[in-house]
Amino acid sequence: MHFETVIGLEVHVELKTDSKMFSPAPAHFGAKPNSNTNVIDLAYPGVLPVVNRRAVDWAMRASMALNMEIATESKFDRKNYFYPDNPKAYQISQFDQPIGENGYIDIEVDGETKRIGITRLHMEEDAGKSTHKDGYSLVDLNRQGTPLIEIVSEPDIRSPQEAYAYLEKLRSIIQYTGVSDCKMEEGSLRCDANISLRPYGQEEFGTKAELKNLNSFTYVRKGLEYEEKRQEEELLNGGEILQETRRFDESNGKTLLMRVKEGSDDYRYFPEPDIVPLYVDEEWKERVRQTIPELPDERKEKYVNQYGLPAYDAHVLTLTKEMSDFFEGAVAEGADVKLTSNWLMGGVNEYLNKNQIDLLDTKLTPENLAGMIKLIEDGTMSSKIAKKVFPELAENGGDAKQIMEDKGLVQISDEATLLKFVNEALDNNEQSIEDYKNGKGKAMGFLVGQIMKASKGQANPQLVNQLLKQELDKR
């Protein structure tokens, strides 16, 4: 029997507001524990919540960017549960009347475009953070009350790879809107995944498991891959899939049982009595719509049609707003479009991955990268020298030409000096001369390599090719 995988994702995104969802306390990351709180966050008796209008604006902006319908009337509800990092013993959320509904995004997997539906986007407040160790627990309520949006996909995702592509695209869109930085390492983007299997051709969904502790997109994919295999083996062996919550164990790549999954009835939702329903008229909607900036698909189209980049390059460059903004900044400084694209996707990305940092953690600027690329373009700096200059530029900033000079890496363009390297290479490799004369193209490349090696990569490659051909024709 063959099974079809059915996946739905619930993504929580922290909004980048200055204050919290229902209180004036600061909502910034990284403050001293329990310093960003006030009487509303701590659930003192008699205090009342006040809705953060900026958070509503940004929830609407995100909804519109995700092609959603904005509800004219929505309301807040109480989701009741007890946990130490939830002082009120309930969370203010939206249950049956969310701010946004019926959206979609288009993803690309294996060269195919697929539309993934989005059921809803609703607003809620975040809980605090509990840390458990050595038999005791610590609670930090700085995060308590931080504005969240929860984005719930339709069960349209059919593989872990599609789930990964969906998350990449969703993060990209939200980052471009400016409502969140979507940093998983800081908790400003979190994902829970629901997965079930059903026999091919069956309309009815199977029993789902919810996966938690998915701290990166890679872990989302790996957790779903393991769970897909686990459920398939269970069903093929005649077993039963239980509705349960499981956590992904990063150390062994497996999912482990946390608890039997609760349903919405267990939370005893009821309308929040301290907050009136939210009414959004057309004027408010239009005002928010005008604030939506250029989104990744629009930039991708521009890069292909205006800049002439391949679709793959355009896709990679627009995945994150910081990379796309950096690319546009460098091009605006006069850097060649394709060279800039190649460097950002190649040398820059390799450096970032190797050091496990973001572009904004470096000393790179569009200006200094453009300066280096223009030196490569006009022949002042070879690609080999650029690879030696770039780490210094990324770590300390400055001017690429000055770094090149300080390191003694100035490209050799003096013909007399280059001719010495050329003739030395020819004298030491007579067989290569014969191979060249017999039409073997690799011989030329070998000789160029010998010259570049002898000059420690500082020979001007264009001049080397010109002089080498000239000298070969004489022999």
From Swiss-Prot:
Function of the molecule: Allows the formation of correctly charged Asn-tRNA(Asn) or Gln-tRNA(Gln) through the transamidation of misacylated Asp-tRNA(Asn) or Glu-tRNA(Gln) in organisms which lack either or both of asparaginyl-tRNA or glutaminyl-tRNA synthetases. The reaction takes place in the presence of glutamine and ATP through an activated phospho-Asp-tRNA(Asn) or phospho-Glu-tRNA(Gln).
The reaction(s) this protein catalyses: L-glutamyl-tRNA(Gln) + L-glutamine + ATP + H2O = L-glutaminyl-tRNA(Gln) + L-glutamate + ADP + phosphate + H(+); L-aspartyl-tRNA(Asn) + L-glutamine + ATP + H2O = L-asparaginyl-tRNA(Asn) + L-glutamate + ADP + phosphate + 2 H(+)
Short name of one Pfam family: GatB_Yqey
Documented EC number(s): 6.3.5.-
Gene Ontology biological process terms from the UniProt entry: glutaminyl-tRNAGln biosynthesis via transamidation; translation
Keyword Protein transport (UniProt): no
NCBIfam families attached to this UniProt entry: gatB, PRK05477.1-1, PRK05477.1-2, PRK05477.1-4
Enzyme class, UniProt record, top EC level: ligase
Protein family (similarity comment): Belongs to the GatB/GatE family. GatB subfamily.
Entry-linked SMART domains: GatB_Yqey
Name of protein: Aspartyl/glutamyl-tRNA(Asn/Gln) amidotransferase subunit B
Assembly mode: Heterotrimer of A, B and C subunits.
GO molecular function: asparaginyl-tRNA synthase (glutamine-hydrolyzing) activity; ATP binding; glutaminyl-tRNA synthase (glutamine-hydrolyzing) activity
Residue ranges of the TM segments: none
Record keywords, A-Z: ATP-binding, Ligase, Nucleotide-binding, Protein biosynthesis
